[in-house]
């Protein structure tokens, strides 16, 4: 049976934990200068309809480090961007490569692609979730503070795809999640109902951050929402992660952001560049955790 990675909780906790464990080992191996060509002669197709820095660089570099090859396919490069049916593209592309990574707008389209693919599909970001980023976040927390189980995390800002994936992670990794959003910017109702036992909803960021172990945020306007930027700056002004907000968390608390960040909006400069911030380690770990994910999916 083909294994896909479309949502974080597609995989059992044991498998997610093993992927992170292997990622830490691969990172140590890479830092020591050891060469591992375990994916030699394997090809990863990377399909994008969104611009990307961390996703493209981490997957492409990761395949190279493991001896494989990564093929970049934007919607301008392939017939999928000119109206070829998703089913047809899935059948053809999967017949020529070993694994496919997709960073596209429609989560539904990723599912359709997976249903018609003969190789594993990785969701590298959709309008619904961002599971690869969460693997990196969980790895980063474990490296810095140990197990995240039974900890309390505060999500501050928009109830977007990253927030959805943190809700999935709360169940998979057994932590409590406080979600603070403006009134009309909560996560999708389906997610609220599905993960109700693992989350608490707030409209006050300071209350959500009380005594938490980790504070996480994301941009106020995601790609495709640029027209709402000015309105959202006003609506979200009380949901900026600054030093005053971080002071509500535990003294040992850390800060994460999937990047890119807008300093002075969702996070202040002194927080993202401060001693509690793990954003650079978090970004670097995308490389190693995705290498471990590729090895898992390719067995």
UniProtKB/Swiss-Prot annotation:
GO cellular component: cytoplasm
InterPro entries xref list: Asp/Orn_carbamoyltranf_P-bd (IPR006132), Asp/Orn_carbamoylTrfase (IPR006130), Asp/Orn_carbamoylTrfase_sf (IPR036901), Asp_carbamoyltransf_Asp/Orn-bd (IPR006131), Orn/put_carbamltrans (IPR002292), OTCase_ArgI (IPR024904)
Source species, domain of life: Bacteria
Keywords: Amino-acid biosynthesis, Arginine biosynthesis, Cytoplasm, Transferase
GO biological process: arginine biosynthetic process via ornithine; citrulline biosynthetic process; L-arginine biosynthetic process
Gene3D superfamilies per the UniProt record, alphabetical: Aspartate/ornithine carbamoyltransferase
Associated pathway: Amino-acid biosynthesis; L-arginine biosynthesis; L-arginine from L-ornithine and carbamoyl phosphate: step 1/3
Record: residues binding L-ornithine: 161, 218, 222-223
Positions annotated to bind carbamoyl phosphate: 52-55, 79, 103, 130-133, 258-259, 286
Enzyme Commission (EC) number: 2.1.3.3
Assigned protein family: Belongs to the aspartate/ornithine carbamoyltransferase superfamily. OTCase family.
PANTHER family membership: ORNITHINE CARBAMOYLTRANSFERASE, MITOCHONDRIAL, ORNITHINE TRANSCARBAMYLASE, MITOCHONDRIAL
Protein purpose: Reversibly catalyzes the transfer of the carbamoyl group from carbamoyl phosphate (CP) to the N(epsilon) atom of ornithine (ORN) to produce L-citrulline.
Protein's recorded name: Ornithine carbamoyltransferase
């Amino acid at each position: 049976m083909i294994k896909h990675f479309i949502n974080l909780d597609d995989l059992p906790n044991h498998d997610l934990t093993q992927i992170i464990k292997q990622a830490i080992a691969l990172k140590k191996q890479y830092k020591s200068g050891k060469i591992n060509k375990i994916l030699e002669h394997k090809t990863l197709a990377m399909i994008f309809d969104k611009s990307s820095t961390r996703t493209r660089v981490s997957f492409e570099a990761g395949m190279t480090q493991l001896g494989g090859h990564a093929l970049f396919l934007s919607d301008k490069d392939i017939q999928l961007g000119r109206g070829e049916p998703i089913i047809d593209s899935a059948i053809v592309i999967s017949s020529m490569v070993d694994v496919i990574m997709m960073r596209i707008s429609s989560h539904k389209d990723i599912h359709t692609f997976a249903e018609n693919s003969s190789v594993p599909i990785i969701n590298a970001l959709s309008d619904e979730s961002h599971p690869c980023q969460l693997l990196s976040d969980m790895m980063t927390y474990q490296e810095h503070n140990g197990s995240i189980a039974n900890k309390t995390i505060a999500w501050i800002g928009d109830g977007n795809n990253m927030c959805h994936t943190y809700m999935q992670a709360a169940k998979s990794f057994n932590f409590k999640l406080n979600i603070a959003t403006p009134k009309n910017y909560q996560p999708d109702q389906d997610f609220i109902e599905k993960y109700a036992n693992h989350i608490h909803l707030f409209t006050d960021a300071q209350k959500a951050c009380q005594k938490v172990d980790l504070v996480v945020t994301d941009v106020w306007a995601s790609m495709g929402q640029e027209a709402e930027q000015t309105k959202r700056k006003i609506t979200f002004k009380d949901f900026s992660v600054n030093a005053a907000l971080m002071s509500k968390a535990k003294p040992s608390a850390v800060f994460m952001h999937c990047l890119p960040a807008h300093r002075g909006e969702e996070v202040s400069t002194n927080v993202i560049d401060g001693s509690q911030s793990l954003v650079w380690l978090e970004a670097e770990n995308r490389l190693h955790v995705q290498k471990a994910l590729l090895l898992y999916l390719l067995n």
